[in-house]
């Protein structure tokens, strides 16, 4: 890989999507080859899997099914979109990657981080981000943001109770500790302008 693979992680309502939308034009103006994408999704097959995963009526979905669907979507997205871009020397900004599975399915769903990590090692052939930025926020604050965003479609995970979202954050904090060599924790409970500045500095430090 010649490019730089940067993933943005965080609980629901942490501001990942808004952040990436702001980072994209900044790096384009710097004449950096840059691409934004998301998980699950980014390509047709993975977007179809995303639809299944997010359907509100699929509350009966079992945790292992959920974990495997995310891994399947990740595999196709990686080989079809991310890897070609990295090989073409792009800065790839990805909304979620493996760490989401570790926090949500591994920890919050109780499948075990090691088991979920092994599933994803198989799916990605050990491809890991060069840098991960974790946007940390209290679940109550993130969910309140979602409730105020009339344009955001509520998905199946949003409907989980507050205890689930608290476990997700606990899981993320464990992931940050486990992979401290590549993950930078950033406080997401601050004005977006300041958040953008802080994240740009982190990425540029890595680029240099």
Swiss-Prot record:
Transmembrane annotation, as ranges: none
GO cellular component: cytosol
Signal peptide annotation: none
EC number, UniProt record: 2.7.4.9
Enzymatic reactions: dTMP + ATP = dTDP + ADP
Keyword Methyltransferase (UniProt): no
InterPro entries cross-referenced by the UniProt entry: P-loop_NTPase, Thymidylate_kin-like_dom, Thymidylate_kin_CS, Thymidylate_kinase
Key word Transmembrane helix present: no
Entry keyword set: ATP-binding, Kinase, Nucleotide biosynthesis, Nucleotide-binding, Transferase
GO annotation (BP), single: dTTP biosynthetic process
GO MF annotation list: ATP binding; dTMP kinase activity
List of residues binding ATP: 10-17
PANTHER family the UniProt entry points to: THYMIDYLATE KINASE (PTHR10344), UMP-CMP KINASE 2, MITOCHONDRIAL (PTHR10344:SF4)
Family: Belongs to the thymidylate kinase family.
Function: Phosphorylation of dTMP to form dTDP in both de novo and salvage pathways of dTTP synthesis.
Listed name of the protein: Thymidylate kinase
Organism: Bacillus thuringiensis (strain Al Hakam)
Organism classification: Bacteria, Bacillati, Bacillota, Bacilli, Bacillales
């Amino acid at each position: 890989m010649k490019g730089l693979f940067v993933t943005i992680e965080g609980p629901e309502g942490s501001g990942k999507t808004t952040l990436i939308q702001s980072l994209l034009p900044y790096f384009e103006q710097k004449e950096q080859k840059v691409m934004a994408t998301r998980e699950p999704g980014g390509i047709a097959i993975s977007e179809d899997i995303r639809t299944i995963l997010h359907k509100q009526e699929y509350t009966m979905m079992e945790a292992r099914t959920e974990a495997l669907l995310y891994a399947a979507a990740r595999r196709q997205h990686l080989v079809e979109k991310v890897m070609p871009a990295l090989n073409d020397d792009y800065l790839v900004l990805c909304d979620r990657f493996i760490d989401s599975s570790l926090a949500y399915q591994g920890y919050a769903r109780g499948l075990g981080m090691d088991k979920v990590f092994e599933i994803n090692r198989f799916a990605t052939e050990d491809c890991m981000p060069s840098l991960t930025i974790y946007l940390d926020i209290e679940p109550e604050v993130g969910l309140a943001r979602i409730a105020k965003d009339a344009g955001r479609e509520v998905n199946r995970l949003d409907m989980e109770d507050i205890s689930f979202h608290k476990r997700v954050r606990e899981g993320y904090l464990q992931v940050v500790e486990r992979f401290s060599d590549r993950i930078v924790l950033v406080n997401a409970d601050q004005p977006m302008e300041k958040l953008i500045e802080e994240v740009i500095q982190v990425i540029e430090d890595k680029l240099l």
